[in-house]
């Protein structure tokens, strides 16, 4: 086969082991998964009720325009329908962005470490990837990113809060950054975890009308608890949306996914409860870190914590796994002595912290 040359050296995404597989290997009767930043509280009761009574006609193609969901999200953010695009998770939106803007003659600028799919999709298109190391506290080096831009740059990526560190860039700094980026370069503001930020930042979706080169990406996979439904979306100027729709598959979000997302966004009381629970979980880990001088906890603003224990990451990961908790080894994330742990329920956080204390 005459494969694209850009695929040479790349590998496919390898998901972690299934919980059942880990239990069988280690002889455990229970496992708690804290590796994928899923919502430990599940999803809204309204979503659960719809799931129990769903009558989706699976033989019928879904609404390719996601009309009902589009209206719901439009009303929620006070936007226009043409300022939205819906995709099979933010992963698909990232793929579409790289497809329309990157090729072998272009480059893209991003932080490192950050969400791996920016780099992966850029390399698939054959583009040069310019990675700017995070600052020592895990924050984006925005000045360094600006300096990396040249006439061949077409996309700049900002993950906010950043995955895997959890650092959050406030709105004033985002706007100051946008003011300095040339207007013909797209800035992707990936806000997959924005609903977890406490206190919540003021509404800023309409920044897309001031900065025509901005797209804000969000998802129903995290705080809304719909990871398996695969519904993400982008908010941008109509011209950006028009270009993306040219390459968007016609039926890329499912009927059930659209319906579940509608119910999820309606229940903001559940979202607030999740945000409070998550903030309390972060406080548990902050208190733990204060008790041990050698422990470094990165600023947590998502639904996860990145903890550097000064111990080889695989050792920490294996130790927690053997005790029934699946986490994410920092070795694969650019942090060789750290682990990333999803914030769980209060008792789950306490159990993990107790194990870490024993390890130290």
UniProtKB/Swiss-Prot annotation:
It is an enzyme of class 2 (transferase). One of its GO terms (biological process) is L-histidine biosynthetic process. Its cofactor is pyridoxal 5'-phosphate. Disulfide bonds: none annotated. The keyword Cytoplasm does not apply. InterPro entries: Aminotransferase_I/II_large, HisP_aminotrans, HistidinolP_aminotransfase, PyrdxlP-dep_Trfase, PyrdxlP-dep_Trfase_major, PyrdxlP-dep_Trfase_small. GO terms for molecular function: histidinol-phosphate transaminase activity; pyridoxal phosphate binding. Keywords: Amino-acid biosynthesis, Aminotransferase, Histidine biosynthesis, Pyridoxal phosphate, Transferase. Signal peptide: none annotated. Its EC number is 2.6.1.9. Coiled coil: none annotated. It catalyses: L-histidinol phosphate + 2-oxoglutarate = 3-(imidazol-4-yl)-2-oxopropyl phosphate + L-glutamate. Pathway: Amino-acid biosynthesis; L-histidine biosynthesis; L-histidine from 5-phospho-alpha-D-ribose 1-diphosphate: step 7/9. SUPFAM superfamilies: PLP-dependent transferases. The modification N6-(pyridoxal phosphate)lysine is found at residue 222. Homodimer. PANTHER family: HISTIDINOL-PHOSPHATE AMINOTRANSFERASE, HISTIDINOL-PHOSPHATE AMINOTRANSFERASE 2. HAMAP family: HisC_aminotrans_2 (MF_01023). Belongs to the class-II pyridoxal-phosphate-dependent aminotransferase family. Histidinol-phosphate aminotransferase subfamily. This is Histidinol-phosphate aminotransferase. It comes from Listeria monocytogenes serovar 1/2a (strain ATCC BAA-679 / EGD-e). The gene is hisC.
